[in-house]
Amino acid sequence: PIVRCYAHGFDDPGCSYNRAYASALSGWNQIRPHLPVMVLEYYNVSKFEDLPLLFTHSMAHDFQVYRRTGAAGFVYMHVPLVNWGMRTLTQVLFAELAWDPDADIAKIKAEFLSRRYGAYAGRLRSVYDQIDMASQQITSWRAWKDRSLLSRLQSWNGGRPERPLQVDDHFQTPEAFDTAGEQMLSLLQAALLTLRETLSAVKHDTAAIRTDIVTAVNPAQQRSAQQSAQLRHALEEDLRLLVYGTDTMQLMLRMGQYYTALYAGCDDRAA
């Protein structure tokens, strides 16, 4: 389902993106003699451009649907090669749910955060939750379909538009797009602030541990130094990815707002 919607369940009949996919999967699995059908998801489709997206909100439900409709297997594109950052959670959930669709997502997520961030897991939970919420309408923003905002903007020549900004039926109007975009950006900026503050706290709390110049004299010191280095690496990787994601989504939002301002003749706002 390369242009599926993640704001709604895969089997939601009210979703204009998903209902055709759900119908197709159900139809294929009713063919006799039965043919094994696999699902190819797109948690990192090329149009997402390695953005720091999370799909925890939809994965538990969707894997249940895939099993219920008779899917014989599950893969997805494209598994990131480097700089997984917070997307590491998606890899963990994918592996766990592909093995057991009934797996406890809340438990898996809590264990993941604890192992990755240790004493700072509580802070990062809010970061992950905010990114997850901000990711829900990503298909309306950028997808392999001409009704996504990215496709609309890419076909625009930059001059004064002759018609209002076209948005999909999930946004419905340019005004609703504007509101949803500001909410999305607010979530990402809040997550970014928490992440920066957490990294600063980690640097302060571990200032005495200088693994580059101090040699551990016992196993406890060695473990402490390794854990400190791993934690900072994880947070710095998360930060790089989230800065990129926030900047990218802000640029898309502002371009959409610029289009609307030009169309309305509000040159002062467009400037």
Regions found by a protein language model. Give the residues of each.
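Catalytic-core regions of glycoside hydrolase
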Residues: 1-109, 115-116, 182-185, 189, ...
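Catalytic domains of carbohydrate-active enzymes that cleave complex glycans
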Residues: 41, 69-70, 96-271
